[in-house]
Structure formats: C-alpha cells, structure tokens
Amino acid sequence: MAKSSDSLNKKLLAAAVGATKAKDIKELIEKGADINTHNEWGLTPIMLAAQYNRSVVVAKALIEAGADIHEAEPKYRSNALHLAADNTTNPKVIEVLLDAGANLDARNYLGETALIMAVNSNTETKIATTLIKLGADINARDYQGHSVLDYAKLAKRTYLVNLLKEKGAV
C-alpha cells in the first residue's frame, strides 16, 4: 500500500470515530481512502463508527460509500451491529445499520446476538427496546444456553425483564 493511501486510511479510521459531518468521510473516500480498511485490531471504519461515533450521518456516509456492514472483527467475530448494540447511545445508528441490510440476529463467536449484547452490556435501555421493536429474536440464546431474558435478569434490568416477558420471552 502506498504511503499516501496508508495515511488516508488512518485518517478515515480516525474520522469514523470522531467526525460529525458526512463531508469529512466523503472527502477522504474521494481522495482514495479504502472504505473497508482495517486498524491494528481488525476494525473497519463502519465498525468504529458503530462502536464509538453517535453520528447517524457518519454511519450513512460510510454505508453509502460501500462499507461492508456484514464483516466481523477477528477477535470476537462481532459485526457493526453487535458493536453498536454494545456501545451506542443513539438508537438511530441501529436503525441505519438495519436499513442497510445488517442481519438483526447475526451471532458473534459466543453466539450473542445484537439484542443479547444490548441487554447485557449497554446501559441505554432504548437500544434494547429499539432492537425488540425492530423484530430481534427475544428468545435468542447464546452458545452456553443463556437467553435474552436470562441476561436481563442477571443485569437487574427490571424494565427489560418486564418488557421481554410481556412480549412472550422465555
């Protein structure tokens, strides 16, 4: 990879985390940055945006430029939707990924779906409720057999426990 391309790719990875405007992303792509470049941990710009950036316009710009929303990072095999479910505070980021075709019930290497990750790790209840509203499998179980409801109980997420039961989760 040419030094200038490497520099552009590093700038794109940084912009995915911190940019607030679509133009910041588009300019780097137009200059030749690789939309699916990887950082040292194997994360792509869309994964970083989903995990750290709450900006819907940045996520949309990356997707419109051809970001692979299905690619999974190498360590845990989590994709952009998993990372957003685990970390974002903006449910619109979840919606943008799903509108672009992200698999709502894709599993990482532990068998966790985005909903399991949201219930287990994300303190923003609205992320889990958004996933439920959009049709996530409320009876999904990880590879150890723990259900979404199990994780909600373990995390003492009373509102989610009640919502899941109301929706028929077991």
Where are these regions (language model features)?
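Intrinsically disordered, low-complexity regulatory segments in ankyrin-centric signaling systems
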Residues: 1-31, 39-43, 47, 60, ...
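Ankyrin repeat A-helix N-terminal signature
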Residues: 14-20, 48-55, 83-90, 117-124, ...
